[in-house]
Amino acid sequence: MVHSKKICLWLLMIMAFAIPKQMNAQQNLQISKVFDQYGKKKGVMMVQLTKEMLQGYNFSFFKSIVIKNDPGAIDFTRECIAKDQEGAEKIKQVVQNGEVTSIVLQLAPRKDENRLILYNESTENPREMTLIYIESKMDTEKIMNMILKKK
């Protein structure tokens, strides 16, 4: 019995160090539910990139999801963002025709990395929403400038 406890403890320690950082991305954020619930549905486009793919951008983690013509998913995403907004350090919103169409949340840094949630919704038909989560050591204003820079 003691031997099996030692083995279990040893395995737990290995797993704790072996779990990649990406598994912790979005930890304790409600938006993770959006990616989990809708990420593999038909007609949804989800992209997740980690350090290797993001070297030129100075991001350590990038995840996005685009959902079209699903009012339930849009409402659910807005609810999740509203909950994550409670812990945000900075909040920026764009209002169009009396309706919030874009949201930028600067979350409290985790370790030495800044975290951003970006949301954009098209109110025209077909309705479409984009949700992006980014982790980076880069200053959040620089991240925003890079994302919004026109090519």
Predicted ranges, named:
Residues 139-151:
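Short, low-complexity, Pro/Ser/Thr/Gly-rich segments in the mature regions of secreted, periplasmic
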Residues 1-31:
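Bacterial Sec-dependent N-terminal signal peptides
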